[in-house]
Amino acid sequence: MARQLFKRKKFCRFTAEGIKEIDYKSVDLLKDFIAENGKIIPARITGTKARYQRQLTTAIKRARFLAFLPYTDQH
């Protein structure tokens, strides 16, 4: 009685929407890729391609530095 795992096909949101560059000022977009505790959600969970994951990480870090996003959930 092995338990069957259903794997959903992951897709990259940025290639589907045709986004070329991720901007650090689009806070609503960046919040979708941050967990409740403030950590960046990895690409293996979100399905984001490596190129966009690097852009996403850089944009989130810039937004944190400029105080558009909090570093943790306790701020």
UniProtKB/Swiss-Prot annotation:
Q: Can you name a GO cellular component term?
A: cytosolic small ribosomal subunit
Q: Does the keyword Ribonucleoprotein apply?
A: yes
Matching InterPro entries = Ribosomal_bS18 (IPR001648), Ribosomal_bS18_sf (IPR036870)
Share an example GO biological-process annotation for this protein: translation
Query: A GO molecular-function term, please?
Result: small ribosomal subunit rRNA binding
**Keyword list, A-Z:** Ribonucleoprotein, Ribosomal protein, RNA-binding, rRNA-binding
PANTHER family cross-referenced by the UniProt entry: 30S RIBOSOMAL PROTEIN S18, SMALL RIBOSOMAL SUBUNIT PROTEIN BS18M
User: Which family, according to the similarity comment?
Assistant: Belongs to the bacterial ribosomal protein bS18 family.
Q: Which NCBIfam families match?
A: S18
Say what the protein does. Answer: Binds as a heterodimer with protein bS6 to the central domain of the 16S rRNA, where it helps stabilize the platform of the 30S subunit.
| Protein name, UniProt field | Small ribosomal subunit protein bS18
| Species per Swiss-Prot/TrEMBL record | Chromobacterium violaceum (strain ATCC 12472 / DSM 30191 / JCM 1249 / CCUG 213 / NBRC 12614 / NCIMB 9131 / NCTC 9757 / MK)
Q: What is the lineage of its organism?
A: Bacteria, Pseudomonadati, Pseudomonadota, Betaproteobacteria, Neisseriales
